[in-house]
């Protein structure tokens, strides 16, 4: 995804094992379509996890290569926060399938500065996921679909709604990265 003066230009491909071979051509395509060069960017944001080891390695390696070559700062963005960002809600319990009957989860509250973790991101058994007590919360993430038989009976009554289709998304990470750069969180 490309954040350009508040506008997002993005590509979405369900690539599976081919993600590493498609990522750089997609970046090139977005830059070309926007008539902007890599060195003209202010920085590069990437999905810093939690997530699959291979996916994180690809994200970090591509980001490091592009940033080093263009002398740009980078900022990592939480994949769980990107799920929360897609909901449009103010309080979100994000649950992402981690495989092997475990989940990555966190609880986020939106304030004037963006998202604040109420429960820090963690890897846990689905039985360990809890909804914070204060206010109205929604559930989001594919963990509610994959491990719904464990999560839904325990949590559904405490959540205003559940969207089990949401996954980490570059278009949702773009505004999060832009805000992080504005706060001076980029790393050279």
Positions of predicted regions on the chain:
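Fold-independent oxyanion-binding glycine-rich loops
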Residues: 26-27, 34, 48-49, 56, ...
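N-terminal beta-alpha supersecondary unit
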Residues: 1-48
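Surface "functional belts" at beta-alpha junctions
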Residues: 15-18, 73-168
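Stable alpha-helical structural segments in soluble proteins, enriched in small hydrophobic residues
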Residues: 30-34, 69, 173-181
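Phosphate-handling active-site elements
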Residues: 33-39, 67-77
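DPxDG-like acidic metal-binding loop motif
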Residues: 46-73
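Acyltransferase
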Residues: 160-188
């Amino acid at each position: 995804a490309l954040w350009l003066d508040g506008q997002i230009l993005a590509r979405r491909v369900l690539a599976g094992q081919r993600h590493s071979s498609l990522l750089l051509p997609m970046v090139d395509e977005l830059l070309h379509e926007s008539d902007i060069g890599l060195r003209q960017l202010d920085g590069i944001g990437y999905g810093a996890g939690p997530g699959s080891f291979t996916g994180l390695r690809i994200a970090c390696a591509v980001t490091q290569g592009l940033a080093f070559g263009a002398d740009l700062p980078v900022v990592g963005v939480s994949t769980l926060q990107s799920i929360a960002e897609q909901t449009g809600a103010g309080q979100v319990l994000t649950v992402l399938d981690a495989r092997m009957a475990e989940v990555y989860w966190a609880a986020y509250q939106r304030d004037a500065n963006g998202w604040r973790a109420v429960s820090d991101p963690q890897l846990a058994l689905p039985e360990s996921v809890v909804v914070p007590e204060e206010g109205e919360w929604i559930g989001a993430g594919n963990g509610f679909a994959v491990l719904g038989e464990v999560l839904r009976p325990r949590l559904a009554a405490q959540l205003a709604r559940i969207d089990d289709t949401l996954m980490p998304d570059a278009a949702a990470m773009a505004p999060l990265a832009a805000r992080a750069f504005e706060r001076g969180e980029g790393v050279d």
